[in-house]
Amino acid sequence: MIKAEGLCVQKGIAIGKILIFQKTKPRIVPDKVTDLEDQWNAFLDAKAEAVRELTQMREKAEDKVSKEQAMIFSVHRMLLEDPDFEAAVREEIKQRHHNASYAVYRAGEDLASIFAGMKDNPYLNERAVDFRDVANRVIRILQHLDDEIKLPEEPVILFTDDLTPQEVIGLDPSRVLAFVTTNGSLNSHTAILTRSLGITALVDTKVRALPEYNGLLAVVDAVGGCFYIDPDKDLLSGMMREQKAFLASQKDLEQMIGVSTKTLSGKRIGLCANISSVVDAKRALRNDAEGIGLFRSEFLYLNRQNYPPEEEQFAAYKAVAQIMAPKKVIIRTLDIGADKQNAYFQTEKEENPALGSRAIRFCMKKPEVFKTQLRAIYRASAFGTIGILFPMIVSVSEVEWIFSVIEEVKAELKQKKIKTGSPKIGLMIETPAAALISDRLAEMVDFFSIGTNDLTQYTLAADRMNASLTSLQDPHHAAILKLIEMTVQNAHAKNIPVAICGEIAADSELTAYFIQIGVDELSVPASQILFLRKWIRSLE
């Protein structure tokens, strides 16, 4: 028996025979060539074919999932048609005399490396995978490689090194019990599509999909995060019981839809969702979120050549507001900086970006960018219940500056007779400074949201990107809990509510403590809402 551990993309337990899918590896070597024009034309032809394929895949995805999720393929097409990508390929061929396949590979890697370094933002980090997928698509067309997943009639466990979004959207869920990959992550476009299709999946197992595993019995435990090849009888019978229990528990969780989130003694706490896109809002609604506690707006600024125009931002915010109405949507303003580089940001590289010009500091340096976002949010507020959340606050003067810009934006919109709502204004409490002056800050705004990920990093003086300091990243640390409690007390003294939106919001070990100290709301991934509601309803 072989056991491997991985990341659970879509929870479930599957038992069945393995189907190995191995792709033909493209030949990538830096061979020099003399037929430069032929190589360039070959690239252009392959690029045109890739555009055609992506258009077809978008149409297929619209039928199988949704228009919003089909945008994944539009994003890939946009990357493919990125002038920087084409210019990089041209330089590799025309200036460095490399063959077309290597030129595409090199151009893709160079662009991917920009995003691959953004370890503190999983969403941005995963865009490196998109560039590599796009480059790989063109290379496979250049080399006439056409691997197809041939699924048998009887459902199987698909095991492969990796799957692209195109391969996932091509799967027939009725023939796939689950899939397992050697590589992968929770935030990739592949993972997003997988969750939409409802296919049980485990990724990043680090075990190669070898031909000798084909046809063997396997167990995918995408609840406990384990993959078993050729399990023994005891494990198999145990996992069959676990599978039955899991299916029963899923039905049990469905009973939590529509019920109130309160303890046995009647204490109530709000339960909202964290989202990063319009698609996520629909998932939040399906999981009966009481609202959106954190809408990360960064996705609008990624994979593009310039700042998103006001109309595009307005459309996204409006869409989420309408999906969730009358429930609230809290939009966090741009939390981006020197650690999340796009060429158009024009920010200087910083030695320690976590302590640099990020979030509100970035916006203070680029007020027009900030005002554009605020105009879009205020316009969208006419279509739902919207709140605005400002990140990385450390001083009263920053909040005063924010309000001055808000007044300018409101005056501009009023002058143009553009209808708006009245968004509530909130602050992220994610620095020790903000927590320590939360009594003063509470006098200025309508609500707080505690970002425990950064609060932990800054309070414990431990860079969360430094793997050697992982043991210090302890949100249960007494100092963190004390700052949280202080913030709650100061907020309630001024009659404003407090939410927690960091990772520990979903930590069931701390749920009772949060309720005890008076936290008003927890904002968690949509997939955690029903489980957490059930847990809260079991507490005294």
Q: Which residues make up each language-model segment?
A:
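Generic secondary-structure signature for well-ordered alpha-helical cores
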Residues: 48-66, 78-85, 91-98, 109, ...
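Conserved alpha/beta-domain cores
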Residues: 249-540
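N-terminal-biased segments
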Residues: 114-152, 219-243, 441-473
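Conserved, well-structured core domains of diverse proteins
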Residues: 1-143
